[in-house]
C-alpha cells in the first residue's frame, strides 16, 4: 500500500499479526514479506533456511546495509564501512574487555548518584525508569568509547542522545510521505532539521579529540601493546591496519577519515546505549514485578565480588551464572542482500537490495523450543548442577536470535552483554527499586518487527542498606 493510502488505513496489532504469520508461514517452512518502518519490505525467512544464510559472506549478506536502509541512516551517516565491526573484533579479548570493564564500573559509580540519587539520601525517589536507564547507559557508553573524562561531558552526551532519539521518528516522518515529497520533508521538517543539527554539533565536539588521539598514536610506536584504552583507540588502530590512515603522517585525507571516524563513534554510541538500555529497562521491569529475584541475584554477585578480591572485575561476571541467565532470559522474552542469492532449502531467489529477517521474537515464544515460553523464568538458562549459564549469554543459535546468528551475528554482543550485566547488577546492588504504579503496566509494545519497552513506567528508588548487601 502506498504511503498516501496508508494515511487512511486502520492500524493493526503488530504482535498478533506477526504471531499469525509465524504459525502460517514460518512454522511450515515458508518465507513471508512484511512492511518495514522505512516503507520498504523485508522477507522473513523460516528456520529451515538458517543453515544457508548464516554462512553467507559479507559481500552477499550485509547487516550494515540493512540497518542503513531500515533506519534511514544512509541519509546522514556512512553505515557501510566495516571498520567499526573489525575494531570490535580487535577489542574482543580478555585484556581489553577487562580494561573496558573498569571504565564501565567507574562510569556507573559516578553516574548513578547524579542520575538516580546519592547514597546518603534515604527517602524514596520517584523516577521514569525508561529515561533514567537510557541516560545511565549513554553515560557509560561514552566512557567506553572515548575514556573516563568524557563520561562527565553532559553537553556531548545530551546532544548525541537527542540525535539517537530522533533517528527512528525522523525515518518514520520522511517515509510516511510519497517518494516525490520526501526530499522536501528531509529538508524542511523540524524533526529532521533538529536531528541533522544535533549530528553536526556532535561531530564538531568529537573531531578535536579524534585528531588528538591520531597524533598520539603516530608519535608513539607500540602505543597499544597493552591493548586499546577505549573503542576510539581500537578504531584508530584498525584504520591504521587497513591503510585508511597513515601511521607516519597526514596524506592529505585526514579530515575525511576523521569525519568518518566521528560518524563511527556516533554509530557505536547508538548501538551500545539504546539496545543495551532496552535490555536493562526490561530487566528492571521484571525485578519490580517479580521481587523474588532481587535477593538471589544480590547474594550471588556479593559472593562473586569476594572471589574477585572485592573489586568489580570482568572475572566477577564469570562467577555470576544466575545473573547471566536472568539477562539472557530478558533478551529472549522481551539483513540486507548484496548479491543475487538462491536459497535451495526453501526454493527462494533474492534480488540485491532485499532486506531479510528472522522471526526472532516468535521463535523465542514458541513452545516447541522453550517450555512455558510466555512465562518469564530468570533461571531458564541456569544449570544449577554445574553452576553455569548454558548456553553462554552471548551464544547465538537458530532458536536464540537476539543478536542474529551466523556470520552476520552482532560482533559487539560480548561487549553489549557485559555492559548490560554490569550496569544492571550495580544498580540493583546500590538501590532498592519498586513500582510506582498500583499495578504493573504493559512491559512494552510491538513496533513493526521490534519489541520496545514501555517508556511511561515509573519507579521508586532509594539507596540499599549496606548490611543488606553484605559487601
Swiss-Prot record:
Keywords, in A-Z order: Heme, Iron, Membrane, Metal-binding, Monooxygenase, NADP, Oxidoreductase, Transmembrane, Transmembrane helix
Main location: membrane
Membrane topology: Single-pass membrane protein
Cell division in keyword set: no
Induction: Expression is induced by the developmental and secondary metabolism regulator veA.
Cellular localisation: Membrane
Pathway(s) this gene product operates in, as recorded in its UniProt entry: Secondary metabolite biosynthesis
Gene inactivation effect: Fails to produce aflavarin.
Identification of the protein by name: Cytochrome P450 monooxygenase afvE
Gene name for this UniProt entry: afvE
Amino acid at each position: 500500500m502506498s504511503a498516501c493510502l496508508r494515511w487512511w488505513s486502520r492500524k493493526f496489532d503488530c504482535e498478533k499479526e506477526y504471531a499469525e504469520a509465524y504459525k502460517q508461514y514460518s512454522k511450515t517452512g515458508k518465507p513471508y514479506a512484511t512492511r518495514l518502518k522505512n516503507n520498504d519490505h523485508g522477507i522473513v525467512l523460516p528456520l529451515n533456511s538458517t543453515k544457508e544464510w548464516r554462512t553467507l559472506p559479507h559481500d552477499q549478506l550485509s547487516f550494515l546495509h540493512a540497518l542503513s536502509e531500515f533506519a534511514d541512516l544512509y541519509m546522514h551517516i556512512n553505515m557501510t564501512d566495516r571498520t567499526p565491526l573489525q575494531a570490535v573484533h580487535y577489542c574482543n579479548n580478555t585484556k581489553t574487555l577487562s580494561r573496558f570493564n573498569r571504565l564501565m564500573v567507574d562510569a556507573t559509580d559516578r553516574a548513578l548518584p547524579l542520575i538516580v540519587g546519592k547514597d546518603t539520601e534515604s527517602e524514596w525517589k520517584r523516577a521514569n525508569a525508561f529515561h533514567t536507564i537510557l541516560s545511565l547507559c549513554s553515560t557509560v557508553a561514552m566512557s567506553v568509547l572515548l575514556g573516563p573524562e568524557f563520561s562527565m561531558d553532559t553537553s556531548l552526551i545530551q546532544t548525541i542522545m537527542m540525535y539517537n532519539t530522533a533517528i527512528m521518528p525522523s525515518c518514520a516522518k520522511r517515509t510516511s510521505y510519497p517518494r516525490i515529497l520526501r526530499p522536501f520533508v528531509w529538508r524542511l521538517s523540524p524533526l529532521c532539521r533538529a536531528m541533522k543539527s544535533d549530528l553536526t554539533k556532535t561531530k564538531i565536539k568529537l573531531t578535536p579529540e579524534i585528531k588528538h588521539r591520531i597524533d598520539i598514536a603516530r608519535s608513539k610506536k607500540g602505543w597499544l601493546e597493552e591493548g586499546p584504552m577505549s573503542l576510539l583507540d581500537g578504531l584508530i588502530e584498525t584504520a591504521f591496519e587497513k591503510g585508511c590512515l597513515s601511521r607516519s603522517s597526514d596524506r592529505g585525507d585526514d579530515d575525511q577519515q576523521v569525519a568518518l571516524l566521528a560518524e563511527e563513534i556516533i554509530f557505536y554510541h547508538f548501538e551500545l546505549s539504546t539496545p543495551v538500555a532496552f535490555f536493562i529497562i526490561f530487566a528492571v521491569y521484571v525485578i519490580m514485578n517479580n521481587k523474588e529475584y532481587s535477593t538471589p541475584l544480590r547474594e550471588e554477585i556479593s559472593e562473586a565480588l569476594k572471589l574477585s578480591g572485592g573489586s568489580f572485575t570482568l572475572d566477577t561476571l564469570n562467577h555470576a551464572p544466575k545473573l547471566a541467565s536472568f539477562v539472557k532470559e530478558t533478551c529472549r522474552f522481551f539483513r540486507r542482500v548484496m548479491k543475487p542469492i538462491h536459497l535451495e532449502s526453501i526454493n527462494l531467489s533474492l534480488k540485491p537490495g532485499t532486506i531479510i529477517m528472522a522471526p526472532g521474537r516468535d521463535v523465542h515464544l514458541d513452545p516447541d523450543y522453550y517450555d512455558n515460553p510466555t512465562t518469564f523464568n530468570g533461571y531458564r538458562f541456569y544449570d544449577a548442577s554445574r553452576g553455569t549459564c548454558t548456553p553462554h549469554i552471548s551464544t547465538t543459535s537458530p532458536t536464540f536470535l537476539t543478536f542474529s546468528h551466523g556470520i552476520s551475528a552482532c560482533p559487539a554482543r560480548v561487549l553489549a552483554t557485559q555492559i548490560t550485566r554490569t550496569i544492571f547488577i550495580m544498580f540493583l546492588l546500590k538501590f532498592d527499586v519498586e513500582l510506582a504504579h498500583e499495578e504493573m503496566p504493559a512491559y512494552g509494545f510491538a513496533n513493526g518487527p521490534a519489541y520496545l519497552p514501555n517508556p511511561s513506567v515509573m519507579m521508586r528508588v532509594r539507596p540499599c542498606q549496606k548490611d543488606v548487601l553484605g559487601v
